[in-house]
């Protein structure tokens, strides 16, 4: 499957298929220098896949740590200075090969290197099907997640589904959260469909039919970002589960998707109070437990820490905490939420996720 953004200018292709990595050569052949920025785990599992590229004298490989620990000022500065040792021109391309963190990090490097060089996203996880599309790049701060960054479009997204074959279950769980999120934002039929396909850990672990849900997720996101690239309005809806989820992730260091799933349960609880919805919280909590999400980790949290991190959320305004809530499946809205409601929801969350 190949999609194309439809901005007024600076558009890029999104190639999603098995063996898509073979397309990379076409996109990097005209650059003076190309740097493959590769997640250490991906390099370990697919080293031979990258060797033919390294036979070219203008293509280099840089191995970076896997996961969020890479997205720090220290790694950013070290990698930036290392790249500058190569006497670069603006006809340079960085290729992010790894999960969402690798793409975020590499894209931010590209946005600031020589005031902007090209970069290409080569996502290798389910989670990165979401983060690789849309041009959000950045690193973390001591004050919170993704607080330093930019909107910077890649020249291409090349998503080779063969990379998913080596994913451990923990990584599958993390990625599934974003796929499930897109279903919640789409509506009841989409949720019923995905829950039927992935009703148990064993079914999710098999990844049978995951391709079709990845396609749907990318198409859904593309429809949003074309209309609201800079997150002024409807793109905020893609942050469903992320206000509380980012706080959980930053505090506990559990994978992004695990935290977002907990954040999704939290927003259901908040919505039932604030919007008088009737979501069956126990049903969704049990679904997470069946898939083996580490939901018990909420017992280790305290509200004051979570509130502190939620205050740093980029959706907030002068009125305080802004959360994406579902009025019903497929119908999101951004709501101001009072602290008293957040406290009650936190207590209810700890009860339902025991």
Swiss-Prot record:
Primary site of residence: cytoplasm
Pathway: Metabolic intermediate biosynthesis; chorismate biosynthesis; chorismate from D-erythrose 4-phosphate and phosphoenolpyruvate: step 2/7
Enzyme class: lyase
Necessary cofactors: Co(2+); Zn(2+); NAD(+)
Signal sequence range: none
Compartment annotation: Cytoplasm
Catalyzed reactions: 7-phospho-2-dehydro-3-deoxy-D-arabino-heptonate = 3-dehydroquinate + phosphate
CDD domains hit by this protein: DHQS (cd08195)
Binding-site residues, Zn(2+): 178, 242, 256
Keyword set includes Secreted: no
A matching Pfam family: DHQS_C
Gene Ontology biological process terms in this record: amino acid biosynthetic process; aromatic amino acid family biosynthetic process; chorismate biosynthetic process
Binding site for NAD(+): 100-104, 124-125, 136, 145, 163-166
Keywords for the protein's UniProt record, in alphabetical order: Amino-acid biosynthesis, Aromatic amino acid biosynthesis, Cobalt, Cytoplasm, Lyase, Metal-binding, NAD, Nucleotide-binding, Zinc
GO cellular component, one term: cytoplasm
Cross-referenced InterPro entries: Dehydroquinate_synthase, DHQ_synth_AroB, DHQ_synth_fam, DHQS/DOIS_N, DHQS_C
Textual note on the cofactor: Binds 1 divalent metal cation per subunit. Can use either Co(2+) or Zn(2+).
GO MF entries: 3-dehydroquinate synthase activity; metal ion binding; nucleotide binding
Entry function: Catalyzes the conversion of 3-deoxy-D-arabino-heptulosonate 7-phosphate (DAHP) to dehydroquinate (DHQ).
Family: Belongs to the sugar phosphate cyclases superfamily. Dehydroquinate synthase family.
Identification of the protein by name: 3-dehydroquinate synthase
